[in-house]
């Protein structure tokens, strides 16, 4: 397949399962070099040689194959870079995550890809997602491993959620053992992200892998509801899209943006068995608040009761496999977190 098809429509090319006749070249009138690294992996770099202070930015979507809006936004970003409509001021790796699931219109085929990073894919060798997790780890490691010493490293992993949310667009920051950075929180404010969830334990997500193993400022963005390809109102994603484009092009963030509210994970509901009962409505919104003493779950001898004056539930899902998380409980820590930004 001619490389022009890849560069004109990265999404359509990837869904078709083709490989380009040429795997690298120049675009944007010679100002940008591109390289196809494999299915759903497209790297860009300015042709100019002043690389010493150049940031390295990984932007991903489609880690869940049915989360189409961010995939469409990322394909448009690549198209505009190729055409020279968007200047490039960084090393950039564009990643479409779970390509087989995208083609099938499914969240995943065998296992949730966003639970298979940091080597966990080795525990499920028969899973059709396992090789992709290993490939994405290797691509991120190689990309950030080639970054100029001391330069900024970013990973923005874009998703949409299965359920509604009290805060329509929110972010999750992986646990790294250090406080969130002011750079990340201010960027999230510029993206008009209303809330940030801070993890307090290591995980197996893509953004956790790049934060821990690649030294990236990493976040997972939840940008709205899951919809089929072509049925998204992309205007609802405009603030986040603008912020990503500014990060890629070296543009300045708007001053005075409201910083997001911050919530910290204080517990989780773990599914012990198929007898798990979640005492919340099937369509309960993420970040719905519950008061002290409310029983939220029961599974045999296990019971989860709200311990703080107010706790909010995020990602409740009783249909996960036993042993996996069936919900997170968070509390508001905005004041303390923003005061401790570094």
Curated annotation (Swiss-Prot):
SUPFAM superfamilies: Zn-dependent exopeptidases. Binds 1 zinc ion per subunit. The active site is at 222. Coiled coil: none annotated. Its EC number is 3.5.1.96. Keywords: Arginine metabolism, Hydrolase, Metal-binding, Zinc. NCBIfam families: arg_catab_astE, PRK05324.1. PANTHER family: ASPARTOACYLASE, SUCCINYLGLUTAMATE DESUCCINYLASE. This is Succinylglutamate desuccinylase. It comes from Burkholderia cenocepacia (strain HI2424). The gene is astE.
């Amino acid at each position: 397949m001619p490389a022009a098809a890849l560069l004109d429509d990265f999404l359509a090319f990837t869904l078709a399962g083709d490989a380009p006749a040429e795997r690298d070249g120049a675009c944007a009138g010679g100002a940008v070099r591109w390289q196809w690294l494999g299915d759903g992996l497209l790297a860009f770099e300015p042709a100019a040689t002043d690389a010493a202070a150049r940031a390295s930015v990984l932007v991903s979507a489609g880690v869940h194959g049915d989360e189409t809006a961010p995939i469409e936004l990322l394909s448009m970003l690549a198209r505009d870079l190729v055409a020279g409509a968007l200047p490039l001021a960084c090393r950039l790796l564009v990643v479409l995550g779970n390509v087989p699931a995208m083609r099938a219109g499914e969240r995943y085929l065998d296992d949730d890809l966003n639970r298979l990073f940091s080597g966990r894919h080795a525990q499920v060798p028969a899973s059709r997602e396992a090789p992709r997790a290993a490939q994405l780890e290797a691509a991120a490691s190689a990309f950030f491993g080639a970054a100029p010493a001391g330069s900024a490293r970013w990973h923005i992993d874009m998703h949409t959620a299965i359920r509604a949310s009290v805060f329509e667009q929110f972010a999750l920051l992986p646990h790294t053992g250090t406080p969130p950075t002011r750079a990340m929180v201010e960027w999230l404010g510029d993206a008009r992200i209303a809330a940030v969830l801070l993890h307090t334990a290591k995980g197996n997500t893509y953004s956790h892998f790049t934060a821990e193993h690649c030294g990236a400022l990493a976040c997972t963005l939840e940008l709205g509801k899951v919809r089929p390809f072509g049925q998204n109102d992309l205007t609802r994603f405009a603030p986040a899209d603008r912020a990503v484009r500014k990060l890629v092009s070296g543009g300045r963030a708007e001053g005075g943006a409201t910083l997001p509210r911050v919530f910290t994970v204080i517990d989780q509901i773990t599914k012990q068995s198929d007898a798990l009962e979640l005492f919340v409505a099937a369509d309960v919104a993420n970040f719905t608040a519950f008061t002290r003493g409310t029983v939220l779950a029961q599974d045999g001898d296990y019971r989860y009761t709200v311990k703080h004056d107010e706790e909010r539930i995020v990602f409740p899902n009783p249909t996960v496999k036993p042993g996996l998380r069936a919900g997170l409980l968070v509390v508001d820590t905005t004041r303390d977190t923003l005061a401790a930004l570094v």
